[in-house]
Amino acid sequence: MAKLALIEREKKRARLAAKYAPKRAELKAIIGDMSKSDEEHYAARLELQQLPRNSNPTRKRNRCAITGRPRGTFRKFGLARNKIREIAFRGEIPGLTKASW
């Protein structure tokens, strides 16, 4: 199980990303708009740099909902591979069967 602080850090990153998403999108639109002047581009870039680092959605890491494991997490289930295996063998995920060929 991952440390609780790491799980809470990821939750904080998700909250910050959601909070600053409109502002970040607005600034990126100004930066990408070629009809704006160089001064406006520069001002928007400086303002974007002033936003918190953790408000950037690329810093968010997907973690297992049960264990908090950061690697081997399936997006579809939100669980790590080993927890998917345990739960699937108990038959708790509908429609999921063991592969055989």
Swiss-Prot record:
Keyword Protein biosynthesis part of the UniProt annotation: no
GO cellular component: cytoplasm; small ribosomal subunit
Gene3D superfamilies named among the record's database cross-references: 1.10.287.1480
SUPFAM superfamilies: Glucocorticoid receptor-like (DNA-binding domain) (SSF57716)
Annotated gene: rpsN
Keyword set, alphabetical order: Ribonucleoprotein, Ribosomal protein, RNA-binding, rRNA-binding
Protein name (record): Small ribosomal subunit protein uS14
Self-association and partners: Part of the 30S ribosomal subunit. Contacts proteins S3 and S10.
MF-aspect GO terms: rRNA binding; structural constituent of ribosome
Superkingdom per UniProt: Bacteria
Protein family membership: Belongs to the universal ribosomal protein uS14 family.
GO BP, one annotated term: translation
Annotated InterPro entries: Ribosomal_uS14, Ribosomal_uS14_bac/plastid
Job of this protein: Binds 16S rRNA, required for the assembly of 30S particles and may also be responsible for determining the conformation of the 16S rRNA at the A site.
HAMAP family the record matches: Ribosomal_uS14_1
